[in-house]
């Protein structure tokens, strides 16, 4: 999807709005697992700058942080999620900034300082700015694994169940560095979701047999600063008209 920080264009825009204030923000680092699902067939074509399986792609990304710090604030054992939907008949990358909505969910276990930290990280790592219709909510974010099936819930708002696929030569299929990759999606394992539900932002999702992804992550603020700077340079280069003799 649905990063979906979920996409390269998102970080181009993030880099464009980053200013002096961002330089003063505390450094951070987080490690853990990404759980993700969406309405597309597996594997989600949005990561390859192709149109979604359905007219639009609706999906989520949930980060379960095992270890993390934002300045002096510990983020161990907390979670953050993002749910988005793209407009019909456009790729996620083409339509970035015009998505139907982008809602951020903060773990209710977090205290005030942790919630602020999670919000700042979420707005950097996840595609929060993909839409003009945004909200930040606090909710319980949980997961469990039963018989190889991962079950993730964002309070009363939504849930999904997914299981990794088996590769033709054994093991689990892995996707490495797709066109839409960001540091969070440099490599991920491919699965299929038994169900994806969502009841917020005026939605009533109930998808079955769609895309599911799982990834380990280890991210830092310095990594994203470097990544965003590189994307900004690429963006500038594409806007520079060719010289003629």
Locate the predicted segments by residue:
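Positively charged n-region of N-terminal signal peptides that target proteins for export
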Residues: 1-6
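Bacterial N-terminal signal peptides
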Residues: 7-16
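Boundary at the C-terminal end of the N-terminal hydrophobic targeting segment
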Residues: 18-23
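Beta-strand-enriched cores of mature, soluble protein domains
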Residues: 25-245
């Amino acid at each position: 999807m649905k990063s979906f920080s979920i996409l390269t264009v998102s970080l181009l825009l993030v880099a464009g709005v980053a200013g002096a204030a961002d330089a003063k923000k505390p450094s951070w680092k987080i490690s853990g697992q990404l759980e993700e699902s969406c309405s597309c067939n597996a594997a989600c074509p949005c990561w390859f700058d192709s149109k979604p399986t359905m007219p639009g792609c609706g999906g989520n990304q949930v980060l379960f942080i095992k270890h993390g710090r934002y300045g002096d604030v510990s983020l161990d054992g907390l979670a953050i999620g993002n749910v988005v939907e793209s407009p019909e008949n456009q790729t996620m990358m083409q339509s970035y900034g015009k998505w139907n909505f982008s809602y951020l969910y903060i773990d209710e276990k977090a205290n005030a300082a942790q919630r602020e930290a999670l919000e700042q990280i979420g707005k950097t790592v996840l595609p929060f700015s993909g839409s003009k219709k945004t909200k930040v909510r606090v909710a319980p974010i949980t997961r469990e694994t039963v018989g190889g099936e991962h079950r993730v819930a964002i309070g009363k708002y939504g849930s999904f169940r997914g299981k990794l696929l088996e590769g033709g030569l054994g093991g689990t299929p892995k996707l490495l560095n797709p066109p839409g990759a960001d540091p969070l999606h440099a490599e991920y394992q491919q699965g299929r979701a038994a169900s994806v539900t969502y009841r917020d932002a005026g939605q009533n999702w109930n998808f079955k047999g769609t895309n599911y992804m799982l990834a380990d992550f280890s991210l830092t603020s310095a990594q994203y600063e470097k990544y965003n700077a590189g994307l900004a340079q690429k963006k500038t280069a594409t806007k520079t008209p060719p010289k003629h003799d």
